[in-house]
Swiss-Prot record:
InterPro entries: RNase_HII, RNase_HII/HIII, RNase_HII/HIII_dom, RNaseH-like_sf, RNaseH_sf. It comes from Trichodesmium erythraeum (strain IMS101). A divalent metal cation binds at residues 23-24, 119. GO terms for molecular function: manganese ion binding; RNA binding; RNA-DNA hybrid ribonuclease activity. It catalyses: Endonucleolytic cleavage to 5'-phosphomonoester. Keywords: Cytoplasm, Endonuclease, Hydrolase, Manganese, Metal-binding, Nuclease. Belongs to the RNase HII family. This is Ribonuclease HII.
Length: 211
Protein backbone atom coordinates (compact mmCIF):
# COMPACT_ATOMS: atom_id res chain seq x y z
CA UNK A 1 0.00 0.00 0.00
CA UNK A 2 1.35 3.43 -0.90
CA UNK A 3 2.12 6.05 1.68
CA UNK A 4 -0.43 8.83 1.71
CA UNK A 5 0.87 12.41 1.71
CA UNK A 6 -1.36 13.39 4.62
CA UNK A 7 0.65 15.73 6.81
CA UNK A 8 -1.75 18.48 5.72
CA UNK A 9 -5.33 17.36 5.06
CA UNK A 10 -7.89 19.29 3.02
CA UNK A 11 -11.49 19.87 4.09
CA UNK A 12 -13.95 20.68 1.28
CA UNK A 13 -10.96 21.61 -0.88
CA UNK A 14 -10.75 24.98 0.89
CA UNK A 15 -9.23 24.70 4.35
CA UNK A 16 -5.82 23.18 4.98
CA UNK A 17 -5.09 22.37 8.61
CA UNK A 18 -1.97 21.36 10.46
CA UNK A 19 -1.63 17.71 11.42
CA UNK A 20 0.96 15.74 13.34
CA UNK A 21 1.82 12.08 12.90
CA UNK A 22 2.66 10.10 16.05
CA UNK A 23 3.97 6.57 16.47
CA UNK A 24 5.77 4.53 19.11
CA UNK A 25 8.51 1.90 19.05
CA UNK A 26 9.73 -0.66 21.54
CA UNK A 27 6.38 -2.02 22.62
CA UNK A 28 7.47 -5.64 22.34
CA UNK A 29 10.95 -5.26 23.83
CA UNK A 30 11.98 -6.78 27.16
CA UNK A 31 14.44 -4.01 27.95
CA UNK A 32 14.27 -0.23 27.96
CA UNK A 33 11.52 2.37 27.63
CA UNK A 34 8.86 2.69 24.99
CA UNK A 35 9.60 5.72 22.81
CA UNK A 36 7.26 7.82 20.68
CA UNK A 37 7.82 10.61 18.19
CA UNK A 38 5.44 13.28 16.96
CA UNK A 39 6.24 14.92 13.62
CA UNK A 40 4.73 17.86 11.74
CA UNK A 41 5.81 18.03 8.10
CA UNK A 42 5.39 20.97 5.71
CA UNK A 43 3.30 20.12 2.67
CA UNK A 44 6.02 21.07 0.20
CA UNK A 45 8.38 18.28 1.36
CA UNK A 46 5.91 15.39 1.24
CA UNK A 47 6.57 14.26 -2.32
CA UNK A 48 10.32 14.43 -1.81
CA UNK A 49 10.15 12.43 1.42
CA UNK A 50 7.94 9.81 -0.21
CA UNK A 51 10.39 9.48 -3.10
CA UNK A 52 13.31 8.98 -0.70
CA UNK A 53 11.61 5.91 0.74
CA UNK A 54 10.04 7.12 3.98
CA UNK A 55 7.88 4.22 5.15
CA UNK A 56 7.34 1.95 8.16
CA UNK A 57 10.66 1.94 10.06
CA UNK A 58 10.55 -1.86 10.36
CA UNK A 59 10.90 -2.16 6.58
CA UNK A 60 14.14 -0.14 6.46
CA UNK A 61 17.76 -1.03 7.15
CA UNK A 62 19.45 0.57 10.13
CA UNK A 63 21.64 2.69 7.88
CA UNK A 64 18.65 3.89 5.86
CA UNK A 65 16.66 4.71 9.00
CA UNK A 66 19.49 6.84 10.36
CA UNK A 67 19.77 8.76 7.09
CA UNK A 68 16.04 9.35 6.86
CA UNK A 69 15.69 10.33 10.52
CA UNK A 70 18.28 13.04 10.02
CA UNK A 71 16.50 14.23 6.88
CA UNK A 72 13.11 14.25 8.59
CA UNK A 73 14.43 16.29 11.51
CA UNK A 74 15.94 18.78 9.07
CA UNK A 75 12.79 19.39 7.03
CA UNK A 76 10.10 18.97 9.71
CA UNK A 77 8.33 22.00 11.10
CA UNK A 78 8.38 20.26 14.46
CA UNK A 79 9.62 16.92 15.75
CA UNK A 80 9.53 15.81 19.38
CA UNK A 81 10.18 12.67 21.43
CA UNK A 82 8.17 11.25 24.33
CA UNK A 83 9.06 8.26 26.46
CA UNK A 84 7.46 6.04 29.07
CA UNK A 85 9.92 4.43 31.45
CA UNK A 86 10.31 0.78 32.31
CA UNK A 87 8.70 1.39 35.70
CA UNK A 88 5.75 3.12 34.04
CA UNK A 89 5.38 0.16 31.68
CA UNK A 90 5.31 -2.22 34.65
CA UNK A 91 2.85 -0.05 36.58
CA UNK A 92 0.43 0.85 33.79
CA UNK A 93 0.83 -2.02 31.25
CA UNK A 94 2.50 -1.68 27.87
CA UNK A 95 -0.54 -0.36 25.96
CA UNK A 96 -1.21 2.48 28.40
CA UNK A 97 2.49 3.28 28.60
CA UNK A 98 2.73 3.42 24.80
CA UNK A 99 -0.18 5.85 24.63
CA UNK A 100 1.40 7.90 27.42
CA UNK A 101 4.66 8.16 25.45
CA UNK A 102 2.71 9.29 22.39
CA UNK A 103 0.81 11.86 24.44
CA UNK A 104 4.07 13.25 25.82
CA UNK A 105 5.55 13.53 22.34
CA UNK A 106 2.51 15.45 21.07
CA UNK A 107 2.41 17.78 24.08
CA UNK A 108 6.08 18.65 23.58
CA UNK A 109 5.39 20.00 20.09
CA UNK A 110 6.08 23.71 19.89
CA UNK A 111 3.44 24.02 17.17
CA UNK A 112 -0.04 22.98 18.23
CA UNK A 113 -1.56 20.72 15.56
CA UNK A 114 -5.20 20.90 14.59
CA UNK A 115 -5.26 17.11 14.21
CA UNK A 116 -3.14 14.25 15.50
CA UNK A 117 -2.84 11.14 13.34
CA UNK A 118 -2.25 8.22 15.72
CA UNK A 119 -0.83 4.90 14.57
CA UNK A 120 -3.05 1.99 15.58
CA UNK A 121 -6.64 1.75 16.75
CA UNK A 122 -6.39 3.34 20.20
CA UNK A 123 -6.92 7.03 20.81
CA UNK A 124 -4.68 8.96 23.21
CA UNK A 125 -6.63 9.71 26.38
CA UNK A 126 -7.07 13.27 27.66
CA UNK A 127 -5.18 14.79 24.76
CA UNK A 128 -7.71 17.60 24.11
CA UNK A 129 -6.60 17.86 20.49
CA UNK A 130 -8.70 16.26 17.74
CA UNK A 131 -7.22 12.94 16.71
CA UNK A 132 -7.72 10.19 14.19
CA UNK A 133 -6.46 6.63 14.56
CA UNK A 134 -4.93 4.98 11.51
CA UNK A 135 -4.48 1.20 11.62
CA UNK A 136 -1.09 0.34 10.13
CA UNK A 137 -0.58 4.07 9.83
CA UNK A 138 3.19 3.72 9.46
CA UNK A 139 2.51 2.08 6.09
CA UNK A 140 -0.30 4.43 5.03
CA UNK A 141 0.52 7.93 6.27
CA UNK A 142 3.76 9.77 5.59
CA UNK A 143 3.71 11.77 8.84
CA UNK A 144 3.21 8.61 10.91
CA UNK A 145 5.93 6.79 8.96
CA UNK A 146 8.28 9.69 9.62
CA UNK A 147 7.45 9.52 13.32
CA UNK A 148 8.15 5.79 13.40
CA UNK A 149 11.59 6.34 11.86
CA UNK A 150 12.55 9.15 14.23
CA UNK A 151 11.36 7.19 17.27
CA UNK A 152 13.15 4.01 16.19
CA UNK A 153 16.49 5.73 15.63
CA UNK A 154 16.22 7.63 18.92
CA UNK A 155 15.42 4.47 20.89
CA UNK A 156 18.11 2.40 19.18
CA UNK A 157 20.68 5.08 20.02
CA UNK A 158 19.63 4.96 23.66
CA UNK A 159 19.83 1.16 23.77
CA UNK A 160 23.30 1.23 22.21
CA UNK A 161 24.46 3.49 25.05
CA UNK A 162 22.89 1.23 27.66
CA UNK A 163 24.50 -1.81 26.02
CA UNK A 164 27.88 -0.60 27.26
CA UNK A 165 26.60 -0.78 30.84
CA UNK A 166 24.82 -4.12 30.37
CA UNK A 167 26.97 -6.12 27.91
CA UNK A 168 25.69 -9.56 28.91
CA UNK A 169 22.34 -9.18 27.12
CA UNK A 170 23.64 -8.74 23.54
CA UNK A 171 21.76 -5.44 23.30
CA UNK A 172 23.86 -4.09 20.45
CA UNK A 173 22.25 -6.71 18.23
CA UNK A 174 18.77 -7.20 19.70
CA UNK A 175 18.04 -3.58 20.76
CA UNK A 176 16.24 -4.89 23.82
CA UNK A 177 14.01 -7.45 22.11
CA UNK A 178 13.69 -11.01 23.33
CA UNK A 179 16.19 -12.92 21.22
CA UNK A 180 17.62 -16.26 22.33
CA UNK A 181 20.89 -14.65 23.45
CA UNK A 182 19.05 -11.94 25.36
CA UNK A 183 16.91 -14.47 27.21
CA UNK A 184 19.97 -16.59 27.94
CA UNK A 185 21.65 -13.53 29.40
CA UNK A 186 18.68 -13.07 31.71
CA UNK A 187 18.87 -16.72 32.77
CA UNK A 188 22.61 -16.50 33.42
CA UNK A 189 22.86 -13.05 35.02
CA UNK A 190 19.37 -12.03 36.12
CA UNK A 191 17.56 -8.90 35.02
CA UNK A 192 18.80 -5.32 35.05
CA UNK A 193 16.91 -2.25 36.30
CA UNK A 194 16.02 -1.56 32.65
CA UNK A 195 14.17 -4.85 32.19
CA UNK A 196 10.37 -4.91 32.20
CA UNK A 197 9.46 -7.04 35.18
CA UNK A 198 5.83 -7.30 34.05
CA UNK A 199 6.98 -9.26 30.97
CA UNK A 200 7.10 -13.00 31.61
CA UNK A 201 10.74 -13.60 30.54
CA UNK A 202 11.80 -11.03 33.18
CA UNK A 203 9.72 -12.18 36.14
CA UNK A 204 11.43 -11.16 39.41
CA UNK A 205 10.42 -14.43 41.07
CA UNK A 206 12.78 -16.22 38.70
CA UNK A 207 15.76 -13.90 38.38
CA UNK A 208 17.91 -11.65 40.51
CA UNK A 209 17.84 -7.94 39.64
CA UNK A 210 21.36 -6.71 38.84
CA UNK A 211 22.29 -3.05 39.35
Amino acid sequence: MEIENSSDLIIDGLYSFLSAGVDEVGRGALFGPVVAAAVILPEDVLDDLASTGVTDSKKLTEKRRCHLASLIRTVAWDCQIGIASVREIDRLNILKASLLAMKRAVLRLKLRPDLVLVDGNQEIRDLFIPQRTVVKGDSKCLAIAAASIVAKVWRDTLIMRLAKKYPVYDLTKNKGYGTKKHKQGIINYGVSPQHRLSFSPCQPSLFEVRS
